From Swiss-Prot:
It is an enzyme of class 2 (transferase). It comes from Blochmanniella floridana. Its cofactor is Zn(2+). Coiled coil: none annotated. GO terms for cellular component: acetate CoA-transferase complex. The gene is accD. PANTHER family: ACETYL-COENZYME A CARBOXYLASE CARBOXYL TRANSFERASE SUBUNIT BETA, CHLOROPLASTIC. This is Acetyl-coenzyme A carboxylase carboxyl transferase subunit beta. Binds 1 zinc ion per subunit. Belongs to the AccD/PCCB family. Disulfide bonds: none annotated. It catalyses: N(6)-carboxybiotinyl-L-lysyl-[protein] + acetyl-CoA = N(6)-biotinyl-L-lysyl-[protein] + malonyl-CoA. The keyword Oxidoreductase does not apply.
């Protein structure tokens, strides 16, 4: 044994015990695959500080971060999903609802709140993608209409964050009717000259993108969000052509004039506040 080995052996303590690291301390980025400290990721609204990849964020977390603290009042909690057709595929619809409610701790795929943003009154809604793909049911449509009505009542702007796969197939034509219902409600908002800002997040597809998602006075998207009606694979199979790189991503849509802005999630609150102050002719302080 040489002198280095003697020093090392004296200072190293061997143990057979495994170190216990609590679950949830680290999160792997879906973009760069780096391990991130979960608390830091949460502070950055689920945006990777290394590669700026926008990871999934819950609807409730999004809204609570968007509105001023202490100003929040939730709306539409009494509007719940119903198994109108006793639908069953591989699983009963009512069982899917129970599973989704347990998974997300939410009663439906749309959460509506009223409050203030930099002291400006606003009504805001957000889709919860983990609740059956953020799909639009009759209850989601009713919650959305209630949000619009509250905006009309308060004479304030309305903001909606979309993240959805489209209409909820388990409710058949009733879910498709929500496209017309929500669009008609937004037409009233437009007639009253009240601003509606639509924020399209990853993904916003199907009936949601074809109705309320694209009807904003200003349509904003998060970076690299997938936005469209049918998915790219379905389109490729239909037209039998290879689609352009980045097709249906927010950057592609901005280039084609489909959306107005791309805004990073950490910058969204201030950007929307600036837009609302101009649209409503209100001043606000960033402090």
């Amino acid at each position: 044994m040489n002198w280095i080995e003697r020093i090392i052996n004296k200072n190293i303590v061997l143990t057979t015990k495994k170190m216990h690291v609590p679950e949830g301390i680290w999160t792997k980025c879906s973009g760069c695959v780096q391990l991130l400290y979960t608390k830091e990721l949460e502070r950055n609204l689920q945006v990777c500080p290394k590669c700026d990849f926008h990871m999934k964020i819950s609807a409730r977390s999004r809204l609570l971060a968007f509105l001023d603290q202490g100003s929040v009042c939730e709306l539409g909690q009494e509007l719940l999903p119903k198994d109108i057709f006793k639908f069953k595929d591989r699983k009963k619809y009512k069982d899917r609802l129970i599973d989704a409610q347990k998974k997300t701790q939410e009663k439906e795929a749309l959460i509506v709140m009223q409050g203030t943003i930099y002291s400006m009154q606003v009504v805001v809604a957000a889709f919860e993608f983990d609740f059956i793909g953020g799909s639009m049911s009759s209850a989601v449509g009713s919650r959305f209409v209630q949000a619009v009505n509250q905006s009309l009542k308060l004479k304030c702007p309305f903001v909606c964050f979309s993240s959805s796969g489209g209409a909820r197939m388990q409710e058949a034509f009733v879910s498709l009717m929500q496209m017309a219902k929500t669009s008609a409600a937004l037409a009233v908002l437009y007639d009253r000259c009240l601003p509606y800002i639509s924020v399209l997040t990853n993904p916003t597809m199907g009936g949601v993108s074809a109705s309320l998602g694209m009807l904003g006075d200003i349509n904003i998207a998060e970076p690299k969000a997938l936005i469209g009606f049918a998915g790219p694979r379905v389109i490729e199979q239909t037209v039998r052509e290879k689609l352009p790189l980045g097709f249906q991503r927010s950057e592609f849509l901005l280039e084609k004039g489909v959306i107005d802005l791309i805004v990073r999630r950490p910058d969204m609150r201030l950007k929307i506040a600036n837009l609302l102050s101009k649209l409503t002719q209100q001043s606000f302080s960033e402090k």
